[in-house]
């Protein structure tokens, strides 16, 4: 029988696989491979800012690999953590032309042996077969502590804020695009694996943080998150982002919540009995 996840004792590596979008069964063009390398550099810089150690950097033949030494045991919560890290990287960095592979979380996943040829499809001038090889290897490969994996996973929480607008006592869905337009926030909307990514013109907390460094995410479940890739903004989340433009947003919501509770309580109160 083949080797399954249950047969593996743990993770040695977190493999971030950046794969160019191209016709099925074909090799990447030189331009597509260069785009994957450029995206790999962005992922590298962002994870270094987050506290990750230096990875092993390699060409797979058609895309780019960043391999981070992690040394995690085989446990359900560890698998869930690695899966979430790849999902967050996908939401943050995948483009229409290059995707972060989110399937590399399972323990029995195998990686290309560098030095082997990648021979997918016909070997043509525009889409040639290439040798996989290591681009960069740190002098000392250090283990990235689990705390930094958790930090990455928590950049986009599973249950982030779900703000609402209140009209009397009937809440309606919060329209984040209308809200950003109201406050003059410039953005570019891009679809991602679990909702929509809004790439901001700049971070409101530091206007020097620009060039896709600051983003708002709206997940399919309605949850909203704000992320700036710079370490100085690590403590800034959706709540702080919204309060930057709308300082009293959460105080108003709490006041409305208490008022609704008050009216609900009064409706269920029994009228006083008249004395006889």
Can you annotate each of these PLM segments?
Residues 1-62, 69-91, 158-165, 174:
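Signature for HUH/AEP ssDNA processing cores
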Residues 53-56, 97, 182-193:
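Short secondary-structure junctions
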Residues 55-62, 101-106, 191-193, 216-218:
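Short beta-strand
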Residues 87-123, 160, 244-256:
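Flexible helix-coil linker/hinge segments at domain or subdomain boundaries
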Residues 125-173:
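Long, charge-rich alpha-helical interaction segments
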Residues 188-241:
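N-terminal single-stranded DNA-binding subdomain of primase/primase-helicase replication proteins
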Residues 257-276:
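N-terminal nucleic-acid engagement/recognition segments and initiation subdomains in replication
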């Amino acid at each position: 029988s083949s080797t399954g996840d249950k047969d593996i004792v743990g993770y040695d590596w977190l493999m971030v696989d950046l794969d160019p979008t191209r016709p099925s069964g074909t090799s990447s063009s030189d331009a597509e491979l260069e785009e994957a390398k450029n995206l790999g550099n962005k992922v590298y810089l962002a994870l270094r800012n987050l506290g990750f150690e230096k990875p092993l950097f390699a060409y797979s033949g058609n895309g780019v690999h960043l391999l981070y030494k992690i040394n995690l045991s085989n446990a359900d919560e560890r698998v869930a953590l690695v899966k979430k890290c790849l999902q967050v990287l996908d939401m943050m960095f995948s483009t229409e032309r290059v995707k972060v592979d989110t399937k590399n979380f399972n323990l029995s996943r195998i990686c290309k042996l560098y030095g082997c040829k990648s021979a997918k499809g016909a070997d043509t001038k525009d889409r040639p077969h290439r040798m996989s090889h290591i681009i960069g290897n740190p002098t000392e490969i250090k283990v990235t502590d689990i705390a930094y994996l958790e930090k990455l996973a928590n950049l986009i929480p599973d249950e982030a804020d779900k703000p609402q607008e209140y009209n009397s006592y009937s809440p309606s869905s919060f329209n984040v695009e209308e809200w950003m337009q109201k406050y003059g926030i410039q953005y570019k909307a891009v679809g991602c694996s679990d909702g929509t990514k809004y790439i901001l013109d700049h971070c409101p907390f530091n206007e020097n943080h620009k060039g896709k460094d600051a983003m708002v995410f709206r997940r399919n479940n309605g949850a909203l998150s704000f992320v700036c890739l710079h370490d100085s903004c690590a403590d800034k989340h959706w709540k702080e982002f919204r309060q930057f433009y709308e300082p009293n947003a959460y105080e108003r919501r709490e006041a409305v919540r208490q008022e609704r509770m008050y009216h609900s309580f009064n409706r269920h109160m029994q009228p006083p009995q008249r004395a006889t």
